[in-house]
Regions:
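M16/insulysin-pitrilysin zinc metalloprotease superfamily fold
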Residues: 6, 10, 14, 30-93, ...
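C-terminal regions of mature proteins
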Residues: 74-177
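A short linear hydrophobic-aromatic micro-motif
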Residues: 22-28
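Hydrophobic side chains in beta-strands
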Residues: 27, 42, 149-151
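A broad, low-specificity signal marking well-ordered, structured residues that form hydrophobic/aromatic
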Residues: 23, 38, 145-147
């Protein structure tokens, strides 16, 4: 949670404000099947998907140093923000249902997960997170899924090959458990 929050604004600032790559620029995180994912997205009318991918990759390489360079005050603000988010009670029956469903099916009915996460957040140090991020994004260990979509007006300058031609056929070939 802290890593995702720490990278949101710098990614937006660099990709949208500084490089002016596109109007839609965002990043987020997701936990699924005990895996933690970071998402980075850019939609552009001016730049092709392979160029956006290259620019995002260059930014992602700088993430550990961004975290290391963060001030202690900023890190504490991110820590408190993450804790506050976890302490928020669901505001509707729908939100509560989604939260319970996630706890049951994604986290083996670990109903005290938020409390454990809050405890871990309180005890983690900035340098620990930076080192973890460095390991995760290292050349030998990083795992990425890149979804590149080319608009009709954009050419595939890198000559990237598509892994499928028809989305419907591709979806039929997926096995979901």
């Amino acid at each position: 949670m802290i890593i995702s929050q720490a990278l949101k604004q710098p990614f937006f600032t660099e990709m949208r404000t500084n490089q002016q790559l596109g109007y839609i620029v965002w990043s987020s995180n997701l936990n699924r099947d005990e895996n933690h994912y970071l998402y980075f997205a850019i939609q552009s009318g001016e730049y092709s998907a392979d160029e956006l991918n290259h620019r995002a990759d260059e930014f992602i390489k700088t993430c550990p140093s961004l975290l290391k360079a963060m001030s202690a005050d900023m890190f504490e603000q991110l820590r408190e923000s993450a804790i506050e988010k976890l302490e928020q009670k669901p505001k509707s029956i729908s939100e509560r249902s989604i939260k319970l469903t996630t706890l049951i099916f994604e986290h083996n009915a670990e109903f005290d997960r938020d409390e454990k996460t809050i405890s871990a957040i309180r005890n983690v140090e900035k340098n620990e997170l930076a080192e973890t991020l460095e390991k995760i994004l290292g050349e030998d260990s990083h795992r990425m899924v890149n979804c590149l979509m080319f608009a009709d007006g954009h050419s595939n300058t890198a000559g990237l090959a598509s892994t499928f031609e028809d989305v419907r056929d591709w979806k039929k070939s997926r096995i979901y458990k």
